[in-house]
Amino acid sequence: MSVIESHDLGLIAPRISEAGVADYVALLKPRVMSLVIFTALVGLLLAPGSFHPVLAITSILCIGVGAGAAGALNMWYEDDIDAKMTRTANRPIPRGKITRPEALTFGMTLAFFSVVTLGILVNWIAAALLAFTIFFYVVIYTIWLKRVTAQNIVIGGAAGALPPVVAWAAVTGSVSVEPMLLFAIIFFWTPPHFWALALFRAGDYANAGVPMLPVTAGPDATRLQILLYTIALVAVALAPWPLGYFSAVYGITSLALGGGMLACALRVYRHRTGSAALRASRNLFRFSILYLFALFAVLLLEVVARGVLALFG
């Protein structure tokens, strides 16, 4: 065999991407993205002052794209973890549909586009907050905290709580108490939501080497933390009503939803073994999603109602 023939046999043909549109959409974490867009929309509509509809749509799109960029960069870095977990093994990178360099390029491009577009077309305060949100989620949470501490989701949850603040800043060019109240609600909601998931996925996290609280401290300690954070969440979510920031309709809804959330958390705390424990943690995880959507939906409906009354009043 000639040297040339031997060399030719060693050549590796360039990889042709097998990714379709659906694979790139999956990189964006569309479920998380939808929650981000919804909470950001509430923050934007609650903000005082007039805002051109085109700028409002631009702001929400940029925040949504920024969230998608963070999701893509998260999957780029965590491909090794995703491949070991049943819940995430079907994501585009572990399946070989998208390579890590492709995911990195996609995520960085979207992050740059979302921040710069928001800055140029809306304002640079909102753009800076969006850039910080992406940085916090990707660098502080994904790259640093997630693999080293069981408090990863507590600290990292700040990134998921920032979209309403970004949206408020898009309208006003500043930050005030109201968006920080929304931030606090999402921040205290995050640990019970994700620890409930971690309780019935503890084996997955242990197999992947992720130090989630049920893996490092055990399920009983996790149940106690879920209960404590849920109590804090109910109090924080109710506080804007007596403080005069949100209406009685919001307050009553918050009280009712908080009662449901607390009841679910108490069941998780009490049922510690067998199918009852598994069912309790699953129910809390599902109800927590309903809780946050319903709570923010009430605020959204109040804004719409005020607008209708102002139009016809």
UniProtKB/Swiss-Prot annotation:
Cell location: Cell inner membrane
Stretches that traverse the bilayer: 35-55, 56-76, 98-118, 120-140, 153-173, 180-200, 226-246, 248-268, 292-312
S-S bonds: none
Membrane topology annotation: Multi-pass membrane protein
Pathway named in the protein's UniProt entry: Porphyrin-containing compound metabolism; heme O biosynthesis; heme O from protoheme: step 1/1
GO cellular component labels: plasma membrane
Enzyme class, spelled out: transferase
E.C. number: 2.5.1.141
Domain of life where this protein originates: Bacteria
Assigned keywords, A-Z: Cell inner membrane, Cell membrane, Heme biosynthesis, Membrane, Transferase, Transmembrane, Transmembrane helix
GO BP terms, alphabetized: heme O biosynthetic process
InterPro entries (UniProt xref): Protohaem_IX_farnesylTrfase (IPR006369), UbiA_prenyltransferase (IPR000537), UbiA_prenylTrfase_CS (IPR030470), UbiA_sf (IPR044878)
Protein's UniProt keywords contain Membrane: yes
UniProt keyword annotation of Membrane present: yes
NCBIfam families per the UniProt record, alphabetical: cyoE_ctaB, PRK04375.1-2
Reported function: Converts heme B (protoheme IX) to heme O by substitution of the vinyl group on carbon 2 of heme B porphyrin ring with a hydroxyethyl farnesyl side group.
Family designation: Belongs to the UbiA prenyltransferase family. Protoheme IX farnesyltransferase subfamily.
Name recorded for this polypeptide: Protoheme IX farnesyltransferase
Provenance organism: Rhodopseudomonas palustris (strain BisA53)
Gene transcribed to yield this protein: ctaB
